[in-house]
């Protein structure tokens, strides 16, 4: 298991490398946006060169609004990317905490197995102690039996020597010598039994002392291991509670960040859609402005030609009917020119209304994302 965890850690890239790649992607995207903005500015400057001062001012105002909106969109995108990076870092931290928890669980399991082995060893020592006690009791009972047999033999010897065997007087000397030999042998046996009994008692006392010492040592070791196990259990419980709190806090933070990220992405999509729609509207309005300008130029040229023709025809022909017709044509051209001028003023008013709405929307967005 530790080798597999090491290989997994080696396979997963560090958070610094991930952040570096994301920063490179963000820089590339910012450069692309900067290039696109420069192209748009060049086109806008090319269009502004053929416009009047008033229209140049309006175009500059529109261009500043569009640039401000694009900057705001870039800010929102950068903040959403930062929120996404925070989420990824939190996920990495959660995975590291999970690995630490698994390692602590494995350590606790190994300690529990070690404690179980020590308890089994203690039980084996207890059974050996009981066997030694039974061996000591059996040795004591055997010693008692030997003492009883020795007393019986003494009694039999006394009964045999006390009897008067008149018909076996010839064997008295032999029995006397045999009795002496038996007595000597009995003394040797007594000394041997006493020596063996003292050795057995000393060995028994030594074994009892050693067993008591081992029992005390094992009891102390068991008590220490139990106290260590209790402290380890308390530490594991505290670590588990702390990890649970941290996981709960991380989960709440992840949920909050996900909600804010979804809101930012949705507002970003809405702003992009709105900017695209406004771009289309501006393009349409610019086309209408160009058409109106062309119509105005055509009307001005027609008015100029009509006035010239009117002057020429007024000089050439002094007829009231011709003068009325020319005057009617001049009035028609003037009316068309007035209508075109009214349409141009209405379009300017509509453009100013759109700009004011855009300023309000930008102010609301700045208030939402300070």
UniProtKB/Swiss-Prot annotation:
Location in the cell: Cytoplasm; Nucleus
Chain intervals for the UniProt region annotation (Disordered): 1-21
Bridged cysteine pairs (disulfide): none
Tissue specificity as recorded in UniProt: Expression is restricted to the adult testis, where localization is almost exclusive to round spermatids.
Key word Nucleus present: yes
Coiled coil segments of this chain: 36-346
Residue numbers carrying Phosphothreonine: 12
Protein family: Belongs to the CCDC89 family.
Protein known as: Coiled-coil domain-containing protein 89
Lineage, highest ranks first: Eukaryota, Metazoa, Chordata, Craniata, Vertebrata
